[in-house]
Design a protein with these regions (language model features):
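Intrinsically disordered, low-complexity regulatory segments enriched in Ser/Thr/Pro
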Residues: 1, 47-117, 178-181, 186-191
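Surface-exposed beta-loop interaction hotspot
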Residues: 95-154
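Aromatic-residue detector
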Residues: 22, 88-91, 123-125
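Negatively charged, low-complexity tracts enriched in Asp/Glu with abundant Ser/Thr
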Residues: 1-63, 132-185
Length: 191
């Protein structure tokens, strides 16, 4: 059994440092049904999936923001003082339909400030992009309080641009169509 007070304090401090408003809480996963529910919603095919399957945790940290994004926080096995933060598939979305869009979780330092910065820089842009693609495919209905600007925010999410550099804005034009050959000239016209 791990120290749940340390996990609760870490989750709370990370939530205060992430951009936007995140609600921290602890989830009781001591019953196998509760752990299975979290495991089925986990949007990570890497180390976090392994950690949930192979190691015992009776509590998990949970973070939820106003857009409906959810993250799970747990101590990293075999690495004292480190944690794992991974996204959950949005509520109402079938996990099997978005498996190919998996944004994967991150291993973070035990310092809440560094952990929040790692999640902000590496995890949240990947999560926003995966949600954007799922929304375009019609697999995810979008955030509950969509203000019309989420697509631009997701498309302009910065990962590690130098200060003062403007990010490139990418707008989706919808699904790509195959090129159509132009008869008699050996050229292919763009869609």
């Amino acid at each position: 059994m791990r120290d749940n007070r340390a996990l609760e304090a870490f989750t709370d401090q990370v939530a205060r440092r992430l951009p936007g408003t995140w609600e921290p809480m602890l989830a009781d996963v001591s019953r196998s049904a509760a752990l299975t529910e979290v495991y089925e919603q986990l949007w990570d095919l890497g180390i976090t999936q392994w950690a949930l399957l192979e190691f015992v945790n009776d509590r998990l940290g949970m973070l939820r923001d106003s857009q409906g994004r959810e993250l799970v926080v747990l101590p990293r096995p075999l690495r004292p003082g480190r944690y794992l933060i991974a996204p959950l598939v949005p509520t109402g979305t079938d996990p099997g339909t978005v498996e190919d869009l998996t944004p994967f979780g991150v291993s973070v330092s035990g310092s809440p400030a560094r952990a929040a910065e790692t999640a902000r820089r590496r995890l949240l842009p990947r999560l926003d992009y995966a949600l954007l693609l799922a929304e375009e495919r019609g697999l995810y209905p979008g955030p509950p309080a969509d203000d019309g600007h989420r697509r631009v925010r997701a498309a302009t999410a910065r990962t590690s641009l130098p200060t003062g550099t403007a990010p490139a804005v990418v707008f989706s034009a919808g699904p790509l169509r195959p090129a159509t050959p132009h008869s008699g000239r050996g050229r292919v016209l763009a869609p």
